From Swiss-Prot:
Subunit structure: Heterodimer composed of ETFA and ETFB. Identified in a complex that contains ETFA, ETFB and ETFRF1. Interacts with ACADM.
Result, substituting residue 164 to Q: In GA2B; reduced electron transfer activity
UniProt keyword Mitochondrion, yes or no: yes
Result for mutant: residue 203 to R: Does not abolish electron transfer activity. Decreases sensitivity to inhibition by lysine methyltransferase ETFBKMT
Modified residues (Phosphoserine): 223, 226
Protein name stated in the entry: Electron transfer flavoprotein subunit beta
Length: 255
């Protein structure tokens, strides 16, 4: 069996099926009493790590999440999918709401060094903020090569071949390990955790640490000025002829 070790980042986000509501004070979105789940792109990253282990190319898969106590539920999901153990970097809820890609990348970089992993896998972006920055920043802090938007990953000895979709075709990268890879939707289809694996996950270890244990300051240099609901779409108007359409467009100043 290979001795490679993989760190997979998993983020707890508001479930994609939930209708987002803005807080009355417009400082963010309502999270209390709202269903949360693992970020879909993170699920893909976990699945890829587990598949590498099933092929006996990886020795250990470690799932990590940064946030409030409820993040342990997200880690348990990763453990049920096949990750070996979890690390919860506990952050108070109020502070967790202000976490950005820069702070999370600092945490991931420190953990990658501490755990001596060979590969950091994470989703290309999270569906709550769509930043698409954490993987790139993590690679920057570690000074590791990176393969973003991966649609196929192949381990070749001490190198990783990454295919990524770009405008007009495919780009193939060959990265020397250790490396950072971010997962695209086309990389794989995540499995559903079976009941036996869900039960086994309850017995797997989750280590709880603080950002300070890693020497990381989570103070953000960004502040949210205001969060607004998207403007309501105005009702459409049915027109019978091309002439009516042109007249209507002139009326509203579009032509």
């Amino acid at each position: 069996m290979a001795e490679l070790r993989v760190l997979v980042a998993v983020k707890r986000v508001i479930d994609y099926a939930v209708k987002i509501r803005v807080k009355p004070d417009r400082t963010g979105v309502v999270t209390d009493g709202v269903k949360h789940s693992m970020n879909p792109f993170c699920e893909i990253a976990v699945e890829e790590a587990v598949r590498l282990k099933e092929k006996k190319l990886v020795k250990e898969v470690i799932a990590v999440s940064c946030g409030p106590a409820q993040c342990q539920e997200t880690i348990r999901t990763a453990l049920a999918m096949g990750a070996d153990r979890g690390i919860h970097v506990e952050v108070p809820p109020a502070e967790a709401e202000r976490l950005g890609p820069l702070q999370v990348a600092r945490v991931l970089a420190k953990l990658a060094e501490k755990e001596k992993v060979d590969l950091v896998l994470l989703g290309k972006q999270a569906i709550d903020d769509d930043c698409n920055q954490t993987g790139q920043m993590t690679a920057g802090f570690l000074d590791w090569p990176q393969g973003t938007f991966a649609s196929q990953v192949t381990l070749e000895g001490d190198k990783l071949k990454v295919e990524r979709e770009i405008d007009g075709g495919l780009e193939t990268l060959r990265l020397k390990l250790p490396a950072v890879v971010t997962a695209d939707l086309r990389l794989n289809e995540p499995r559903y955790a079976t009941l036996p694996n869900i039960m086994k996950a309850k017995k797997k270890k989750i280590e709880v640490i603080k950002p300070g244990d890693l020497g990381v300051d989570l103070t953000s240099k960004l502040s949210v000025i205001s969060v607004e609901d998207p403007p309501q779409r105005t009702a459409g108007v049915k027109v019978e002829t091309t002439e009516d359409l042109v007249a209507k467009l002139k009326e509203i100043g579009r032509i």
